[in-house]
Amino acid sequence: MRRFFVFVVFCGLCVVIGAVPAKPIVKDSVLADGSVVQMVLRGDEFYHYYEQITDCGLRITDYRQQIVERRERAIAKRRMSDTQAERPYMLGRAPHQAERGLAILVEFSDNSFTKVRQNFDDLLNKDGYDYNGATGSAMNYFKDASNGRYVPQFDVFGPYKLDREMSYYGQNDREGLDMHPDQMVVDAVAKLAADSLAGVDFADYDTDNDGNIDNVFIYYAGYGENEGAPEDAVWPHAWEVYDEYVMGQLSYSGKRIKSYACTSELQGSVGSTMCGIGTFCHEFSHVLGLPDFYVTDYGSSHKTLGDWDIMDAGAYLNDGNTPPTYSAHERFYLGWLTPEILKDSGDYVLEELQKSNKAYIITEIGEHNLDGGKPNPNTYFLLENRQKTGWDAYLPGHGMMISKTIYDEDKWYNNVPNNDKNSQGYDIIEADGKAPNGSYGKAGDLFPGTSKITSYVLYAKYLIADIEEVDGVISFSFEEEQEVSVDNEECVFGLISRLNDSELLGVSVGTIVYCYDGVGRLLWRKECVGNSLTFDTPNGLYVLRIIDGENVRVIKGI
């Protein structure tokens, strides 16, 4: 079995900053003894390292706690220095329908563009953009994800030659952070402001008229460190410009530079293939208010959404040319989808998300305020239909996606929603129950999926059953089960728990019993051949669903 041996090459901090995760490309590396090993880059702009793929179980344990401690100190420092009344992530913001975005192309004194401005204008704005197998432009992506509610226009300027070398901006400090990427933004805006032919009016990019340019997006010449380029290259990310860390003018005609994001001109670390829209859309999604859904402090290596989501590794699907569409959760959060509350028993149908913009929401109490930015209850499940078409063509699989959200504003603000393995803020329920570390997604994650899982129990009382997919359409049944207490004298069932097994009493020949674990996954299905059923006792809480003719009952056991 292949495992990962961690080499801590360089590390850094991630506070509320957003960044695209490393592209998981495996490459050969020569060690000091001359041996060749396979390495894969992990992490993002704010903490990254190489892992060696080996056949042994070696691991390093000391560095993870150090990372967590550094990160916690950085968050405290960030909060102390933040004098803005508004948090940098505009939580739950619903963007304007025709918002304008500012994009600037910059070259370094020692590095020039191989592509021209029209290439980037097409990448961002051209309807039906298909260069290098692309599914569409950035404009197409956001238009489709918002169901036509958000159709941004990206104004592209440059390229401008900066006075400093690439290493000035991208060189890593001792903690692995790029030295001066924010200065690159200040220098780029200065070049644009000095270009009389451009005739830019920065007021066009202050949609909410708060005195700040809504966002400055930088495309820099060459490659990104996230795809294996040298450490002197800039790693794509999104953040803000602070006076104390930069030199030069920050305000023009009463409009100040504040939020920015950036990414590279080219894919990979060699060649001349132009970038796709994946990294741009990932970083611009931070501008809209979405956090990262991968593990941002690298104090853990548990599975997150991976290829299923653009705010995780999905930004790299089809080499960044076909990032997956926004999930129902992201659309709900941004105000682009209002899910239907599922509480009445019956049969239901789900059309594909990209076609229908439809999802169901399930809460423990059967009610919800339907405000994705400030959800109440803050814990809920969403059901959506994902098919391998359009923006989702490169997903690991297809079927019904069941996701769970535990919304915590502080975790979203600090960009740490999924860092706690035992309480992830947003994740999918793997239908096959398998969530191996290092997995970026698999066909068995959705329902019925390759494992043919057709039922699931939520909150130990809501049953989703008979899940079927026909021609890309999902059908299922939903019902709230009537719970039976085994202590009730009127109960016709009894449950005896012994050391190694348990026995269900009061059943009859032909009674069907389903057993689910504490999180709702089906463990087994048995048909009774007598008046009792003996089974191995599951670990922890479990739920028995008993179907005896037309009668359906539920028993909880421990």
Model-assigned labels for residue ranges:
Residues 70-73, 498, 522-538, 549-551:
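Glycine-centered tight-turn motifs at strand-turn-strand junctions
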